[in-house]
Swiss-Prot record:
The keyword Zinc does not apply. It is found in: Cytoplasm. Its main location: cytoplasm. The gene is gacA. Pfam families: Ig_CFAP65_4th (PF24507), RhoGAP (PF00620). It comes from the Eukaryota. This is Rho GTPase-activating protein gacA. Rho GTPase-activating protein involved in the signal transduction pathway.
């Protein structure tokens, strides 16, 4: 989700040097030139809590190892990060690592208020690629960042989904969201996003006229799932399913509740794309802004993560394009029969 709330009137354009139809080579994934860099033992920091809530005002700890498999000394540092909701520290915060050596990084976290989030931390390597670590924080029950099976479900246009999704969709539609230019691309105001998210977690939300905020919260809901939707599909299926039918079949083979959650979302995006002449959000544009919320691309190999991110966009575009094509055929058939 983007951070800008500017209401630009231009449509999204796409420019990519990646050939989606070509299978990625070893060089494309960065494997061949990455073996001589900094390696990280794990990318998810959950402080050994699993699904247990993180305590407030108490320090929890985790650790991981970085190793230098290059032929030269490497310098590294963690980018400064001090959100007001929590304190996070790495020890050491910077340093150097001789070739062939390893170092243990100790991590301390203290949460000041109840939040559910997956926070990204950047580990920079001088003259090399960056690493992205995910800090998993779960402090409260609610509707964001929790197992969807624990939420109240309803039937929404043939899909069984958590009640909060149906509520946000109704708010979006009732307030003209389907016709809003840049819907799902333009971000809502951060203060309003936070306020409404907290209200939803308290089960104290009915509707909102700020449709960009509601659209942002739908993306956030998917992004903060304990297991992102597309992570339930084998990685090789994302990389190599260049054929639309293969992508559709992979989506159909998803386990529940991921399958219903993806089907519901695709139906909503289909509705949005049907007004693309007004809202400027085609299937391709929607895939670009929504796909990053459906897959956690954290990887010890940043280049692989970059390629995988683009493959996820193409995967989602293929699935959505199929639904658009089916909808058009059914509409034509209905008109003929009428």
């Amino acid at each position: 989700m983007g951070s800008s709330s500017s209401k630009s009137s231009s449509s999204v354009t796409v420019a990519s040097s990646i050939d989606y139809k070509a299978k990625p080579t070893i060089d494309e994934l960065g494997t061949s030139n990455y073996s001589g860099g900094l390696e990280v033992s794990k990318n998810l920091l959950d402080f050994n809590l699993g699904e247990k809530p993180c305590p407030l005002k108490s320090v929890v700890q985790d650790q991981f190892t970085i190793s230098n498999s290059s032929k030269t000394k490497l310098k590294f540092h963690f980018e400064p990060l001090q959100p007001k909701e929590f304190q996070l520290s790495f020890s050491p915060t910077s340093g150097s690592l001789d070739k062939g050596k390893s170092k243990t990084i100790k991590v301390k976290l203290m949460v000041n208020q109840k939040i559910n989030t997956n926070h990204k931390v950047v580990l920079r390597v001088e003259g090399g690629a960056s690493h992205f670590l995910t800090v998993k924080i779960r402090c409260e029950t609610g509707v964001f960042g929790v197992d969807p099976n624990t939420l109240e479900h309803v039937e929404d246009e043939g899909f069984r989904v958590p009640y909060i999704l149906a509520l946000m969709k109704r708010s979006l539609i009732d307030n003209g969201g389907l016709q809003q230019e840049g819907i799902f691309r333009l971000a809502g105001e951060q203060t309003e996003i936070k306020r409404l998210k907290e209200a939803m977690n308290r089960n104290d939300f009915t509707s909102s006229t700020d449709i960009n905020t509601v659209a942002s919260l739908i993306k956030i809901w998917y992004r903060e799932l304990p297991t992102p939707i597309l992570n339930s599909i084998p990685t090789e299926k994302i990389f190599y399913s260049t054929d639309i039918d293969e992508c559709v079949q992979s989506a159909k083979n998803l386990p529940e509740p991921q399958k219903s959650l993806l089907d519901w979302l695709m139906h909503l995006l289909l509705m949005v794309s049907s007004f693309s002449d007004v809202n400027k959000m085609t299937a391709q544009n929607l895939a670009i802004v929504v796909a990053p919320n459906l897959y956690d691309v954290s990887s010890s190999n940043p280049m692989e993560g970059l390629v995988l991110s683009q493959k996820c966009v193409q995967f989602l575009h293929n699935v959505l394009s199929h639904k658009v094509a089916v909808h058009k055929r059914e509409s034509v058939a209905y008109e003929v029969l009428s």
